A protein has these predicted regions:
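Intrinsically disordered, low-complexity acidic/Ser/Thr/Pro-rich linker and tail segments
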Residues: 21, 28, 35, 47-50, ...
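A structural motif specific to WD40 beta-propellers
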Residues: 204-207, 245-248, 285-288, 325-328, ...
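Conserved strand-to-loop turn within each blade of WD40 beta-propeller repeats
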Residues: 230-233, 270-273, 310-313, 350-353, ...
């Protein structure tokens, strides 16, 4: 029965897509068809399925008169006419005659056609199966299990899911002769289990990282197993995401830290003391202090060896983090610069003068001033093609970076859009109106609004998303998990006891397996700390 099920599954997908598969839902594609191995021609009659030695002959009687003429007439009919004739014929058969037909037909559909194909072609056929069906197919028979462990087959499945690293496991059990372990299959299974943990795994007690006393954590970075928190207490702290220990405290700023970036062993911070500092994360040493701004450094964006900083002095500066040299100064805004994006080629800035500007940093030229917002610009996203800006005027605007034209104005939020994230034309925006929206920036359509009975009860403070989930935090003291595709609420990941009475989740950062939350309060009801939740699985 398993063989019948999987053949029907494969054939259905084959029929759905046609002989040449031109498009796949969710961007999925099968393994490339092996060169020079076309699919065998579809049998024209049931006789083509049967080996002569397997045919059941009734030799006890002579063929009735007119049988050949009747068969010739049957062959001349169309497909629908043949089906009608068979229906009428079955209605006139006795049970023993129907049983005879079943004994002839059923064995032919229980044959393992996959085992008759060349290995390359069999793998191509199996590539049409979803991973869950492929795992079930491995239980069908020994040969199918060998095929279903093929590493290249699972590599393609991993690519479809955005998994780019195989997983090598030291197994205690000896694998049976003839079977090989697929690292790509292990990687796929691990990711599936991690996703399940996020959705419904037991929420273990988080690691609690206490620091910064009762001050506000203003910025948060998370890379590898290292967490960096910046605070208005003038310091940054470097933490181990594994042990929860504070590895070092970065002391040197004489004002609150309001922005930071991190890459590898380099940390960059911006402060109300009007400077940026470049730190060695391993040693805690301050490598450079970058002087030039005349007011608070409010935002920054790091790309390779350069960082662009935006300040309340209305300027932006481009710095070389290796030498500490200021390479360029971008002047043109007439109010504080609140947000900046930099892709190595273009700088995009948003400011309290209601403007968004696109710059060529090498020539210090403003290429476009994007006008349209009627209040302060607080958030930006830039993918090299589109600029997306969020404003206190409640709107979000999508711009063409080359022409400066406004492509779409996204309306629906009721207050300040404080945070956004953009990936592959999907934008997720968080707003002070307590809602989160998912947009398609190509069409300007709002795909989902994350609301309902489980929605946030106060302003959304931070968000992050991947191909499956949206994670949001709020002034209401909760961190929520949502389904990206459906917009459905999944569950609360964090709920502060002081939520609703002052407890706040200021910032969140997530990796594939961990969630870091910066929490505290403005009225002393919640101690300032970091919470680290782990969703990893043990594949030993």
């Amino acid at each position: 029965m398993r063989l019948v099920f999987f053949y029907s599954t494969i054939m259905k997908r084959k029929l759905d897509h046609g002989t040449e598969v031109r498009s796949f839902p969710s961007g999925k594609k099968p393994c490339p068809s092996p060169t020079g191995l076309p699919f065998p021609a579809t049998p024209t009659t049931f006789r083509d399925f049967r080996v002569n030695g397997q045919r059941r002959r009734i030799t006890s009687i002579q063929p009735p008169t007119g049988l050949q003429e009747w068969l010739h007439t049957f062959q001349s009919w169309s497909g629908p006419e043949k089906l009608l004739a068979l229906d009428e014929l079955i209605d006139r058969c006795e049970p023993t005659q129907v049983k005879h037909m079943m004994q002839v037909i059923e064995p032919q559909f229980q044959r393992d056609f996959i085992s008759l194909l060349p290995r390359e072609l069999a793998l191509h056929v199996l590539s049409f199966l979803e991973p869950k069906d492929l795992l079930q197919a491995a239980q069908t028979c020994r040969y199918w299990r060998i095929l279903a462990e093929d590493n290249l087959l699972w590599r393609e499945k991993c690519k479809e899911e955005g998994i780019d690293e195989p997983l090598y496991i030291r197994r205690k059990k000896v694998i049976k002769p003839g079977f090989t372990h697929s690292p790509w299959k292990s990687a796929y299974i691990r990711q599936h289990r991690i996703d399940t943990n996020w959705r419904r795994g037991d929420l273990k007690s988080p690691k609690v990282l206490k620091g910064h006393d009762d001050h506000v954590i203003t910025c948060l970075q998370f890379c590898g197993n290292r967490i960096v928190s910046g605070s208005d207490d003038n310091t940054l702290k470097v933490w181990s995401a594994v042990t929860g220990k504070c590895l070092r405290t970065l002391v040197g700023h004489t004002g609150g830290v309001w922005s930071s970036q991190m890459r590898d062993n380099i940390i960059i911070s911006g402060s109300t003391d009007r400077t940026l500092k470049v730190w060695n994360a391993e040693t805690g040493e301050c490598i450079h202090t970058l002087y030039g701004h005349t007011s608070t450094v409010r935002c920054m964006h790091l790309h390779e060896k350069r960082v662009v900083s935006g300040s309340r002095d209305a300027t932006l500066r481009v710095w070389d983090i290796e030498t500490g040299q200021c390479l360029h100064v971008l002047m043109g805004h007439v109010a504080a610069v609140r947000c900046v994006q930099y892709d190595g080629r273009r700088v995009v800035s948003g400011a309290y003068d209601f403007m968004v500007k696109v710059w060529d940093p090498e020539t210090e030229t403003c290429l476009h001033t994007l006008q349209g917002h009627t209040n302060r610009v607080y958030s930006l996203q830039f993918d090299g093609i589109h600029v997306v800006s969020g404003s206190l005027d409640t709107s979000i605007r999508v711009w063409d970076v080359e022409t400066g034209n406004c492509i779409h104005t996204l309306t629906g939020h009721q207050s300040l859009t404080s945070g956004m994230e953009l990936k592959d034309n999907i934008l997720v925006s968080g707003n002070a109106d307590s809602t989160v929206k998912i947009w398609d920036i190509k069409t300007g359509q709002c795909l989902q609004t994350l609301q309902g009975p489980h929605k946030h009860q106060s302003a959304v403070t931070c968000l992050q998303f991947n191909k499956n989930f949206v994670i949001t935090s709020s002034d209401d003291g909760t961190v929520k998990l949502w389904d990206l595709r459906t917009g459905e609420f999944i569950r609360n990941l964090v709920t502060l006891e002081s939520g609703g009475s002052g407890g706040v989740v200021w910032r969140i950062r997530a990796s594939n397996t961990k969630l870091v939350c910066a929490v505290g309060s403005r009225n002393g009801t919640e101690e300032t700390k970091l919470l680290v939740l782990d969703f990893d699985v043990d594949m030993k």
